[in-house]
Amino acid sequence: MAAAPSATAPKHNYTLGTNASQLELYKYLKTVPPIPELRQAVTIKKYEEASVDDTLYPLIDEHQIIMVVGAFFGDEGKGKTVDAVARHPACTCVARVNSGENAGHTVFDDIGRKYVFNLAPSSLLTPNTRNYVSSECVMDPISFMEREIGQFIKSNMPYKDKLFVGNVFVVTPYHKLLDLLGSAPNSSTLKGMSPIHASKVTKRGIRLDHIFNDEGVLRARLAKDMDTYYGLLKVKGLTDKDVVRRCEEENADGVERVPGYVVDFARAENKIDYLVKLYTERVKNNKDFPRRCDVTHELRAALARGEKLLLEGPQSYWLSNAREKFWESTTSADTTAGGLLASAQFNFQRYKVLVINVHKAPGSSRVGIGANPSSFVPQDYYSAQDIKTLEALPKGGCVDFDKIQNFFYTKAFNTESKTFNGIYEPLEYEDATGKYNIGVAMSIASARHHGECGAVTKKPRVCGFFDCVLHFEVNAVQGPYLSISAVDRGDDYDRIGITIAYVYYDVGNKMVDANGRVYKNGDIIKAGDPVPCEMALYHCYPIVKVINGWKGAPIAASKRRPNEPLPKGVCEFIANVEFFTGAKVISIGNGPRGSDIIYLKQ
């Protein structure tokens, strides 16, 4: 059990072992009365496997616009569902319509070659699709060419007739430096998202078309927008040499978080000349740059012809800047289903829209900073200790995942007790490297065992329980259809936990006023109750329902026969998620390949 960070001063002396503050916290939390839902009987349906033709395709047939969106904090494994939808015969167009390269997904072609996409739609390798990056997206065209298009050039994979780019907002090197210099350590992807969206809403900066037109206008707009960059340097008392040094420090561990051309910009004496030359040579006069078009017009025309359109959602519902609850720690675009539809600029009265939410469990995760009530450790546990990659985790510590998860679910959760209230005891797990708070051990072991690190940042993700409190709202806004990825991870668990409620507790007995409701110690927030703002969520702890696992009856595609009955534990997990959230689970992931999906008979 980890003490919550303060919303105003989230600096802590975190420890590996259980400390006095955690023991003091548990001293109170163990007195919280059990809520009836912990013992409430949930009807366990017999979920049966069906084909994609009998489950997903009929849904697609009934709609013109299909959206695949994240339902938690990103990194849910959306690419697999995107690929499945894109392979529908009538789905001809796939588009990214907002946000930028702060997303990340890995796909493999038919001969096993690996491609990593950040802004380009992940269906670029899917036959018979046209792929678009819409004008409401933000793009660093240099990074886009180097990291994404460069993969196609290197492998001689044609893309000119499959990928089209609209008049995007241009992320410049100074946007990325503003991100680096202005963000708290380990709190950002360093892709310049906040600064470019600030330029966007203040109508400064440049769009892609500016690079292809009058150079004088291009120079003037860049100069005006760079006032913010120079202003930050002045306020912080930084020189160009200081900025270069900061970039080198960020890249010192071998992970290039600040690209070379961004460092060169910081070194450049005449920065406007540097940018104009950079964009002229590597964008305007670059024969390899993708074809440009009015994406909105092309997509509307496709819909008018009766074609189906897939909108690929970046990030997720709770990382959307339009969501009040986590506003301080979100991305800078509206990445909800409604935000995607608005960015696409369609007449929503004319078309039927299908939304498929994607979540991940076990091992639901988040990167960055902010509140995360269902996590094993506070969300800033790694960032506060400057742990930037999985390799920086305690060497040799918490490597026995099987032993740790068993200890966690059978010892820390005393489910046999009549007074069990869904809150685990902060016991210590010990291995050859020392003693670990069980939440810390579970967090480290989960990150290692499941390879949970950011697709963009490489930072270890903070793992936790499937959060029914948060998903209830997602389902209310853009449900009911839900695909849960990585369920085959449950093959390695004796039991599975899901969060069905929170309890509010502040060690200083402080109350939080959120939307007129005052939250005080002992208040319970259940699935279906209003979700408070982050100021309150920092002091919320998960009430966990523990479900029997299915260890010994694996569902992983490499071990399971097709159409084999699903284990009782899997059915119990799905039934509880549906019961507490109102969602309708249409598929579960059971392996790393795109085809490793079990569709559920509807």
From Swiss-Prot:
Cofactor binding mode and count: Binds 1 Mg(2+) ion per subunit.
Function in brief: Plays an important role in the salvage pathway for purine nucleotide biosynthesis. Catalyzes the first committed step in the biosynthesis of AMP from IMP.
The protein's name in its UniProt record: Adenylosuccinate synthetase
Reactions the enzyme catalyzes: IMP + L-aspartate + GTP = N(6)-(1,2-dicarboxyethyl)-AMP + GDP + phosphate + 2 H(+)
Residues where substrate binds: 455-461
Positions of the catalytic residues: 75 (proton acceptor), 105 (proton donor)
Binding site for Mg(2+): 75, 104
